[in-house]
């Protein structure tokens, strides 16, 4: 059941405003001239941007924050905020309306002609691509996503048009609250084992979401969607697939996967639309692009506008984001933290290695540096993680990023031991400092380094880039790597 949201002028206060989902909502509200404040113990560039927009931000989550405000606000929390949080406890004591982040997003979805993108993987890329298409098509959409995009310099933009594009998260079950005009489902797998015990529970949440949508855009290449997702008899379903023989409404052929992107011919219900080009690598991103094509066509965009927009789209931050290169050592930052995502990202890395033949080196390698995210996920998918790194020449594994979990069900060393049964080159370096030291002693010209995970591992990239940029190349080349 949704909690009522007051858009009539009562202030909003976000506990944990610096989070990627919370900050996007705050951005949209303040752009609508609504009073917004928030707190976060870890300030970052996103909170700085909100401060520039006029948001009052408290640097700690303290009970006194609410007393310092001129009017008792509606208090917005995410699932990460627990009942023992002092600011939350004060909000309850003062009688402030308490809203879950999803209540606010659901209310915004109701106020627009909305497209909500759901799925275990690919949500951020697909939703940002759809938002970019609408922007290129002159629609001026409002966009709320779980990643940052250079095209609108952040994780949200507030447009003057009637459309909202939102990323719809399933991690805590709140996906069931959303009722958009168009709902996209990219795929369904078991994830978030801290909330779901089995795949059946995940399917049920997605079914509830699908049956709240006026139209569902669904990937027919996902067997769980195709064979197990049940929608209402009168539900409008638009399907997409990478295979013409699937019978999907949108499909492709003549696919060319390359180190700089992907080309394909797009078909719409048996009619050739034309050629599609994307800078994003791999089959998983071609599926994301095809979902964007389907949504664009539903909204009345011509294929020329759609194909031009997809060709120009650069992607979202931390989604195979090339952070820099020094002496032929390239660093890529990717949010992959589920075994399926890791396999897809490593496959894309293999594609990119093909473009690096200028480095004549017998040890040109794909180096995967991975920080597992959450004990529950690592424990549940221990075997799947162990088998996911087959495309990597070297795997460097850190300890597990807890993301607030306290029950240490499994240790990073245990995962490293299991991984070593399937992979010849696995190095366990528990801390970020140990990872940096190891990589400084190991990387060589021609290496493609994929920094993988949803935690803080990507913080190592700037120091490593600086280190290699200052070293003479002959010094790097003297030592033969593992």
Swiss-Prot record:
Gene from which this protein is expressed: murC
Transmembrane stretches, start-end: none
Name this protein carries in UniProt: UDP-N-acetylmuramate--L-alanine ligase
Highest taxon, organism lineage: Bacteria
Pathway the protein contributes to: Cell wall biogenesis; peptidoglycan biosynthesis
Entry EC no(s): 6.3.2.8
Swiss-Prot/TrEMBL keywords: ATP-binding, Cell cycle, Cell division, Cell shape, Cell wall biogenesis/degradation, Cytoplasm, Ligase, Nucleotide-binding, Peptidoglycan synthesis
Pfam families: Mur_ligase, Mur_ligase_C, Mur_ligase_M
Enzyme class: ligase
Annotated GO biological process: cell division; cell wall organization; peptidoglycan biosynthetic process; regulation of cell shape
Described purpose of this protein according to its UniProt entry: Cell wall formation.
Chain coiled-coil ranges: none
Binding-site positions, ATP: 119-125
A GO MF label: UDP-N-acetylmuramate-L-alanine ligase activity
Reactions catalysed: UDP-N-acetyl-alpha-D-muramate + L-alanine + ATP = UDP-N-acetyl-alpha-D-muramoyl-L-alanine + ADP + phosphate + H(+)
Localization in the cell: Cytoplasm
Taxonomic source organism: Cyanothece sp. (strain PCC 7425 / ATCC 29141)
UniProt main location, coarse: cytoplasm
């Amino acid at each position: 059941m949704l909690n009522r949201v007051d858009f009539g002028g009562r202030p909003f206060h976000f506990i944990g405003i610096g989070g990627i989902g919370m900050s996007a909502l705050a951005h949209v509200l303040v752009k609508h001239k609504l009073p917004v404040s928030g707190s976060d113990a870890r300030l970052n560039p996103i909170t700085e941007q909100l401060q520039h927009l006029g948001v009052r931000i408290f640097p700690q989550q303290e009970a006194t924050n609410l007393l310092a405000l001129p009017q008792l606000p509606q208090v917005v929390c995410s699932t990460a905020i627990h009942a023992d949080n002092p600011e939350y406890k004060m909000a309850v004591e003062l009688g402030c309306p308490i809203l879950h982040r999803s209540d606010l997003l659901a209310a915004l979805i109701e106020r627009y002609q909305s497209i909500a993108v759901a799925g275990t993987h690919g949500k951020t890329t697909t939703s940002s691509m759809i938002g970019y298409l609408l922007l290129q098509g002159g629609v001026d959409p409002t966009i709320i996503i779980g990643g940052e995009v250079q095209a609108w310099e952040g994780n949200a933009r507030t447009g003057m048009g009637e459309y909202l594009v939102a990323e719809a998260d399933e991690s805590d079950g709140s996906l069931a609250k959303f009722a958009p005009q168009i709902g996209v489902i990219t795929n369904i797998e078991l994830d978030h084992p801290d909330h779901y015990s089995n795949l059946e529970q995940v399917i049920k949440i997605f079914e509830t979401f699908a049956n709240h949508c006026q139209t569902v855009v669904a990937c027919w290449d996902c067997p769980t969607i195709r064979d197990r997702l049940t929608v209402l008899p009168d539900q409008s379903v638009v399907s997409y697939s990478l295979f013409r023989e699937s019978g999907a409404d949108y499909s492709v052929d003549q696919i060319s996967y390359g180190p700089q992107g992907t080309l394909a011919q797009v078909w719409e219900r048996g009619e050739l639309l034309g050629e599609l080009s994307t800078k994003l690598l791999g089959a998983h991103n071609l599926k994301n692009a095809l979902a964007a094509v389907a949504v664009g066509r539903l909204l009345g965009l011509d294929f020329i506008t759609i194909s031009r927009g997809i060709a120009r789209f650069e992607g979202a931050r931390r989604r195979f984001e090339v952070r820099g290169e020094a002496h032929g050592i390239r660093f890529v930052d990717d949010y992959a933290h589920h075994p399926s995502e890791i396999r897809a990202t490593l496959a894309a890395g293999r594609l990119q290695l093909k473009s690096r033949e200028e480095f004549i080196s017998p040890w040109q390698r794909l180096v995967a540096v991975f920080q597992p995210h959450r004990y529950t996920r690592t424990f549940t998918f221990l075997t799947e993680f162990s088998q996911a790194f087959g495309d990597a020449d070297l795997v460097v594994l850190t300890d597990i990023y807890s993301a607030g979990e306290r029950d240490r069900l499994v240790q990073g060393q245990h995962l490293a031991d299991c991984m070593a049964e399937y992979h010849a080159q696995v190095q366990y370096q528990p801390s970020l400092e140990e990872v940096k030291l190891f990589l400084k002693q190991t990387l060589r010209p021609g290496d493609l380094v994929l920094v993988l995970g949803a935690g803080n591992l990507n913080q190592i990239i700037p120091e490593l880039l600086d280190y290699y940029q200052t070293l003479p190349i002959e010094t790097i080349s003297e030592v033969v790597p593992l």
